[in-house]
């Protein structure tokens, strides 16, 4: 039986791979490196310049379809990462373990298998000591070649890898779509609230007000003991950066804009409805009868309240300072129309984000079942 037609089998990497150690000091191939999350990237993307220096002459000249294993530990890949080069060629650090797969196997599939999180179990056993001073794991080329792979026939490898490639392309498209929607929404918010939108500018006159004149409530939330906040509970607890947890009592009931008052993301805004608990690190904002709360969500975001935070060890917003800020607003009916228009973007974005979560979940499930 031809090896390409064999059913699933277990084989050491060294039996299907061979070392690549070619160098070419005269090569003009791009200088690249391995990123745990993105694969091969230009070295200048991370270091602002190519920092190979005198060691460049020792860099490995990798060709398209060959692989490199970066045995450097990172947060994303604790035991290093392995990727196939898809560019025609590249010069890469000589500390990488470089190799090529023989023609009886489908290289993209092998690359996926080697970069799968389940491979960490084997790599962990190979680490002979702690991380070296240069940040590299003590995994030699010979050690790496000893890891075992569970391989189907060549044709099945190709079918699987090609399907996952299409899925990755679909995920990348979804990410670009979400980025475009968010960018378009930001542009729409700026265009409308700066008074440049003829559709809404002509609809009513815009008048200047302070934030205090627009709101029936604009105050910090209430103090709550950390012992009362749990992973589960009846009501969400909002702090300066979003939901902190849940508790069994509420401080606010209704529709409010929550502004983060303290923390790294102070000035962030979100709309909440129903019963919630707002801690002292959040500001509860509710429009008065002449204005619309949903409109304030976009207005406060447009005003970038974070720029008014007091600088210090813990950035924070002073409510009395924010209440004096001035802004231009239309009448309530126009506010409602603007809020409805902008919320349609939020609905589209959240719908597409749910689709992205589903696609990523399906990918993880497939990889979990494929590689053992």
Where are these regions (language model features)?
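Amphipathic alpha-helical coiled-coil/heptad-repeat segments
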Residues: 4-11, 15, 151-207, 326-372
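A short glycine-rich beta-alpha junction/loop motif
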Residues: 90-95, 129-155, 277-281, 313-333
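Generic structural signal for buried aliphatic residues
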Residues: 62, 67-68, 342
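Ligand-binding loop in jelly-roll beta-barrel domains
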Residues: 101-106, 288-291
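Non-catalytic DNA-recognition/assembly elements of restriction-modification systems
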Residues: 4-24, 146, 200-222, 227-237
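Short alpha-helix capping/helix-loop boundary micro-motifs
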Residues: 47-56
């Amino acid at each position: 039986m031809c090896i390409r037609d064999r059913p699933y089998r277990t084989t050491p990497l060294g039996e299907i791979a061979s070392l690549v150690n070619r160098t070419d000091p005269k090569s003009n191939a791009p200088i690249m490196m391995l990123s745990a999350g993105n694969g091969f990237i230009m070295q200048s993307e991370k270091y602002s310049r190519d920092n190979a220096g005198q060691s460049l002459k020792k860099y490995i000249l990798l060709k398209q379809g060959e692989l490199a294993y970066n045995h450097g530990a990172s947060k994303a890949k604790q035991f290093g990462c392995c990727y196939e080069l898809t560019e025609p060629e590249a010069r890469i650090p000589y500390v990488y373990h470089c190799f090529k797969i023989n023609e009886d196997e489908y290289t993209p599939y092998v690359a996926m298998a080697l970069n799968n999180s389940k491979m960490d179990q084997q790599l962990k056993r190979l680490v002979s000591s702690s991380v070296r001073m240069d940040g590299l794991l003590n995994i030699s080329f010979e050690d790496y070649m000893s890891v075992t792979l569970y391989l189907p026939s060549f044709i099945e490898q190709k079918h699987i890898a090609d399907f996952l490639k299409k899925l990755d392309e679909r995920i990348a498209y979804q990410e670009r779509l979400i980025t475009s929607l968010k960018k378009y929404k930001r542009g729409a918010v700026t265009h409308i609230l700066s008074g440049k939108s003829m559709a809404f500018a002509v609809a009513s006159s815009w008048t200047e007000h302070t934030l205090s004149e627009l709101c029936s409530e604009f105050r910090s939330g209430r103090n709550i003991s950390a012992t009362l906040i749990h992973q589960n509970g009846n009501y969400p607890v909002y702090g300066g950066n979003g939901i902190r947890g849940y508790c069994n009592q509420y401080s606010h009931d209704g529709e409010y804009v929550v502004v983060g008052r303290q923390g790294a993301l102070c000035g962030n805004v979100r709309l909440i409805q129903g019963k919630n608990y707002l801690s002292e690190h959040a500001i509860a904002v509710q429009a008065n009868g002449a204005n619309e709360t949903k409109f304030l969500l976009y207005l406060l975001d447009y005003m970038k309240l974070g720029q008014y935070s007091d600088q210090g060890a813990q950035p924070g917003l002073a409510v009395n300072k924010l209440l004096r800020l001035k802004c231009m607003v239309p009448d309530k009916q126009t506010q409602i129309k603007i809020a409805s228009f902008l919320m349609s973007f939020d609905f589209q974005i959240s719908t597409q984000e749910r689709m992205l979560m589903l696609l990523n979940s399906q990918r993880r499930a497939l990889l979990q079942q494929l590689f053992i």
